[in-house]
Amino acid sequence: MANSMNGRNPGGRGGNPRKGRILGIIDAIQDAVGPPKQAAADRRTVEKTWKLMDKVVRLCQNPKLQLKNSPPYILDILPDTYQHLRLILSKYDDNQKLAQLSENEYFKIYIDSLMKKSKRAIRLFKEGKERMYEEQSQDRRNLTKLSLIFSHMLAEIKAIFPNGQFQGDNFRITKADAAEFWRKFFGDKTIVPWKVFRQCLHEVHQISSGLEAMALKSTIDLTCNDYISVFEFDIFTRLFQPWGSILRNWNFLAVTHPGYMAFLTYDEVKARLQKYSTKPGSYIFRLSCTRLGQWAIGYVTGDGNILQTIPHNKPLFQALIDGSREGFYLYPDGRSYNPDLTGLCEPTPHDHIKVTQEQYELYCEMGSTFQLCKICAENDKDVKIEPCGHLMCTSCLTAWQESDGQGCPFCRCEIKGTEPIIVDPFDPRDEGSRCCSIIDPFSIPMLDLDDDDDREESLMMNRLASVRKCTDRQNSPVTSPGSSPLAQRRKPQPDPLQIPHLSLPPVPPRLDLIQKGIVRSPCGSPTGSPKSSPCMVRKQDKPLPAPPPPLRDPPPPPERPPPIPPDNRLSRHFHHGESVPSRDQPMPLEAWCPRDAFGTNQVMGCRILGDGSPKPGVTANSSLNGRHSRMGSEQVLMRKHRRHDLPSEGAKVFSNGHLATEEYDVPPRLSPPPPVTTLLPSIKCTGPLANCLSEKTRDTVEDDDDEYKIPSSHPVSLNSQPSHCHNVKAPVRSCDNGHCILNGTHGAPSEMKKSNIPDLGIYLKGGGSDSASDPVPLPPARPPPRDSPKHGSSVNRTPSDYDLLIPPLGEDAFDALPPSLPPPPPPARHSLIEHSKPPGSSSRPSSGQDLFLLPSDPFFDPTSGQVPLPPARRAAGDSGKANRASQDYDQLPSSSDGSQAPARPPKPRPRRTAPEIHHRKPHGPEAALENVDAKIAKLMGEGYAFEEVKRALEIAQNNVEVARSILREFAFPPPVSPRLNL
């Protein structure tokens, strides 16, 4: 065996037999007694090592060497090692931490080994002299081998000290069986002497002789320091998997196989195969020096070319068997005898994944199954990525890797190995069946629950999705979230706002996660239409049961442009989509709620939208559950997307109601929706409409349909994406108008409150068609600073206020406005203005953000100063109302921009004019403006606040008497107002 290995290893000690015998004796002694104790690796020792490394670099820079810039390139490796050591020292800069580092067992051994290897390289130059410049000399080969060792040491220090912080005790071994062995014998140790390791390994896998032990050490000890680190052990177990037959595999592949080359580089493999260029099928294999833990196989093609490849997702013996069958790997190292490796292919038991009842219920709610691959939604999961543990189907993994995808498609972790798995389906019980029947099957499919990492990776699936089926996006009712499957397993920190709703859904924690997954799903840029979002493609490949009509296709210009239809996932109403005109059908939540644009509030908005999505067939209970779960998830999403609060200006609402921007991912409710009880009571107070709305809250779907049935509100509700209740719908409509879909989106409190009256009116009038990007926030009645601090509370207030205001408004509006008069496309100026608005205005900032208010502030400050609104109400609602009112008008055009034919009430222009006058440059005739101003002044003279007067006039279409009756009923804070402060 030793002879065969020497023959295949040009770096063997055959050049100097006497020296080789001496070194062999030294190795035997060290193997028997173990390595000496290491001195502390203090700063002085590290700096001394740096000097030695620098000397090696200078020697290697001699032009006579003519080193090739190919791996392993020592002139890159040593400087990188130096930089990483500097990073480590910077993390342990103070005296106490530095003392801990200098006493770290692994670090001491590493520095000592690095110093010895550097001295050895220097000595090599001194002894080799001119022979070092001969490319085929043994001394030059020894330098190449040292380069490989330095390369292994660099990879090891980066793995044990990622980002300069010691993580050796937390290092994750890829193979579960191997990890169990290490934990059992060595606990959390990072490195152990070879002698100790050999004894422990012998207890599990018998080592037949001392000669075999020496050969095994030369294979495992990649850094040649007489120690085995957890990193080296992980590499070895990945190379010669599976663990159950690891020594047998090693004997077949490394000891006796003529194709195995130890410590060879890419260039050396190419040079070695050059002599077999006339013998196609000749091959050799080596450890990849750039991807430790994987094999590199070099072979001669039929036309005499030499190629090298790294097999993925299969053991080496399987790759060699497959290549032999295909005619690629026939002659190992040019020899006619090709070992038969089929004996290593003993069927290994698949890892069985048991589906828990909780997972079963969760996936029932989504209308999917745990077994289904969440990337393609076509095949069952049959492979597990190691070490992260994500599950998917083999075809998706292969497509991802062939598209040059780096790391796990879910979490971006390095793929160190894969394991075949079988998912054992859960045997449905009565509870599970009941859960499935309650939840709409069109709920968003969630990510696998098998992932621990909650990473943004928000880009992770875009590439794979595009590789898979980009064209199916529009047709598929469902989109897979971008978050990692395992991430779903981890329950998010409960948001205080979510807490009231957690008990409603059948599986509250999971529903929250669903929302979370939705928001996280990678979507097109804010300016891109939801349809074009690659993330949408992934799950749409395979629609969930009874897929609704394509939600993403923009419907023909609706009578009222759908503001932001509820997400396919969240809205259970999509089922009803069949009964609703295509334009009315809500868009998928992804399209509706741009997580980035809306931020936290958007998430809430998304919940609302989803809840509001029309679905007549859904029971009240299901709608309530969906609503609350969505609300909870929105909060989760809000947390995650606060950084995205501002949607880009480009965000536009399409005729189908989709936001062109990321906003489409998370529609309207910015603020955590007030408890359902608060929303419903407010609705009930408003009257029959409110009652219907409260019922709708229970049946988001049913309620939405009902509202749609109401003529004036019909276009509005459709556009606005049915929300949990009227309150919700109104907020949604606001988003349509250009408010972040929901009143809550902008300063949910203020907006929602104001939007309660104007929004309803707007929706009745068709204003709901405004796009989120177009929103022109009206100046907050109160100074923006007040609104911004109260965003969170205002959001809560907004829903209740909106509900209270909406019912009466809804009644009036419904009576006054024709249900389906589609106004002509909004003037170009509106769309332009809305588009020109700052991104903040276009995407209403979440309840916690002032971005949306900022644009309105400049216009509204004077106004707000003139008429202070009641503190309880205005704090949250005034700015929102003003913004919303103006945005409703302005955004109607913007939504029309997206669709070019937003449905509007018969008199949209006057409403726009009023808001525009205050919020933007007046676009309407001066006479009309003066007329509106006179009416506003008249009503303000009666003691009403400016914003309320403005909203009332907008709803009443500038009819003073109707506006006065509205103000009498809604001018003062409704009985629910205390809830706004919650």
UniProtKB/Swiss-Prot annotation:
Residues 891-927 are annotated as: Interaction with SH3KBP1. Ca(2+) binds at D221, T223, N225, Y227, E232. Residues 473-486, 714-723, 884-899 have a biased composition (Polar residues). It catalyses: S-ubiquitinyl-[E2 ubiquitin-conjugating enzyme]-L-cysteine + [acceptor protein]-L-lysine = [E2 ubiquitin-conjugating enzyme]-L-cysteine + N(6)-ubiquitinyl-[acceptor protein]-L-lysine. Its EC number is 2.3.2.27. Induction: By serum starvation. Residues 241-343 are annotated as: SH2-like. Pathway: Protein modification; protein ubiquitination. Residues 465-588, 702-723, 745-929 are annotated as: Disordered. The modification Phosphotyrosine is found at Y363, Y664, Y708, Y889. This is E3 ubiquitin-protein ligase CBL-B. It comes from Mus musculus (Mouse).
